Amino acid sequence: MNLSDFKPGEGTEVPEEEKSVSVRTQTRRVALQALYQWQVNHSETVDIIKQFSEEGRLVDTDVALFQEIVNEVANHAADLDELYAPFLDRAVARIDPVEKNIMRMGVFELQNKLEIPYRVVINESVELAKRFGAEDSHKYINGILDKAAEGLRSLEKTQTD
């Protein structure tokens, strides 16, 4: 499903073939959809969170994590952009909104969710890009977040590589 084709209440249920999808993975998927709506429609995050809740789109998610990701990424978007921008081959403004929000979420987690291994953060971001991003965007995002992790998680990265 492409985010540009997204319709409220559609695509947030966990399909039978993906019943094993983790709560965190589902939370990230729905958070990405909320951030896309925030960026494209310029809606307030509080209104988006309320809408998602009222529409039942937070089923099978960690609601606290969803709220944290949406609020923190939206409130600190420019700061998060600065963390991955040095590794881009173009201006941040030229990055597709879906890919931009995937990278924002990734660097947010790399910086603030130290209990989640950096490889998990990158893998989850790559999977979001495969599912919602443009063709081959997952390769681009993988490279950018891997470089960002060198600065944000340098000790962890040197110990595991």
UniProtKB/Swiss-Prot annotation:
GO terms for cellular component: cytosol. The keyword Transcription regulation applies. Residues 1-22 are annotated as: Disordered. GO terms for molecular function: RNA binding. Belongs to the NusB family. PANTHER family: ANTITERMINATION NUSB DOMAIN-CONTAINING PROTEIN, N UTILIZATION SUBSTANCE PROTEIN B-RELATED. NCBIfam families: nusB. This is Transcription antitermination protein NusB. It comes from Hydrogenovibrio crunogenus (strain DSM 25203 / XCL-2) (Thiomicrospira crunogena).
